[in-house]
Amino acid sequence: MTKLADMKCEACQADAPKVTDSELAELIRLIPDWGVEVRDGIMQLERVYKFKNFKLAMEFTNKLAELAEEEFHHPGILTEWGKVTVTWWSHSVKGLHRNDFIMASKTDQLLG
């Protein structure tokens, strides 16, 4: 299987399939630091990244913004002193699509 971080997001429309339960179980293992949250009935991926200060958190946020623009897929981002909370889900399908797992993996690579 190709590494998630090496994959590209595909255009996603309202009729695109959400990940199945078996796909979810397989994909979540590839991004072990991420959790699945359900908000307003919508499944989402979420991770909190820790930093030594606000400046480093903001630098990470800006790198993530650039990545999101490159891939045309945008997360929820909460930047605070010493941490950034990133939430991925596909608004168009109101849940999780393979793109969200690709972007979670790419987000992890921003730390390296």
Swiss-Prot record:
The keyword Lyase applies. GO terms for biological process: tetrahydrobiopterin biosynthetic process. It holds the Pfam family Pterin_4a. It catalyses: (4aS,6R)-4a-hydroxy-L-erythro-5,6,7,8-tetrahydrobiopterin = (6R)-L-erythro-6,7-dihydrobiopterin + H2O. GO terms for molecular function: 4-alpha-hydroxytetrahydrobiopterin dehydratase activity. Keywords: Lyase. Signal peptide: none annotated. Its EC number is 4.2.1.96. HAMAP family: Pterin_4_alpha. Belongs to the pterin-4-alpha-carbinolamine dehydratase family. NCBIfam families: PRK00823.1-1. This is Putative pterin-4-alpha-carbinolamine dehydratase. It comes from Shewanella woodyi (strain ATCC 51908 / MS32). The lineage of its organism: Bacteria, Pseudomonadati, Pseudomonadota, Gammaproteobacteria, Alteromonadales.
